[in-house]
Amino acid sequence: MDLVLKRAFDIFSSLSALLVLAPFLLFVALLIKLDSPGPVLFKQTRWGKNCKAIKVYKFRSMRTDLCDVSGVAQTVKNDPRITRIGAILRRTNVDELPQLLNVLLGHMSVVGPRCHAIGMRAGGMLYEELVPEYHQRHAMRPGMTGLAQMRGLRGPTDRPAKARARIASDLYYVGNFSIVMDMRIIFGTVVSELTRGKGF
């Protein structure tokens, strides 16, 4: 029943948000076009449910000539690839709003383990090598936010310890999922965004 409620919530919330935010999303698209040449949206292949590859949508925040389509090259502070508008979009997480379309289409969920690019590494090791149970996190749809993000585990995972901490949170979520937990994560994410700062 919890999974049925989760999908119903995903459809209702993503469709409502897309309709309400449509004028704002169009305004952001215009700013991106005026700021730098290239497409408004950026598509990237990432892990989906049951280890199926999915295309995830984001507002383009980087220069097209320097963009890493694979997503393996993680973003760092003061990254020279990021455009002026892109810096604002990433800092406020507005760049991720197009993922509402992924949620509506059933590729993603509002809450779940964050979708990783295929071939992610930390300390030179693939995530699958760092944590043998890594792919268990893909038993559920990836989310726009998750337990790890609520706990403030953000930014580049350049060290194995950082990657393991996030994956541990993801595995805990998959093993203990409930609709009540999802509501707590949504509330906790909002609090975390307001108190711990934004991304880059």
Curated annotation (Swiss-Prot):
Q: Which GO terms describe its molecular function?
A: phosphotransferase activity, for other substituted phosphate groups
| Entry keywords, A to Z | Exopolysaccharide synthesis, Nodulation
InterPro entries the record matches: Bact_transf
Domain of life of the organism encoding this protein: Bacteria
UniProt-listed GO biological process terms: polysaccharide biosynthetic process
The UniProt family comment states: Belongs to the bacterial sugar transferase family.
What is the recorded name of this protein?
Exopolysaccharide production protein PSS
Which source organism does the UniProt entry give? Rhizobium leguminosarum bv. phaseoli
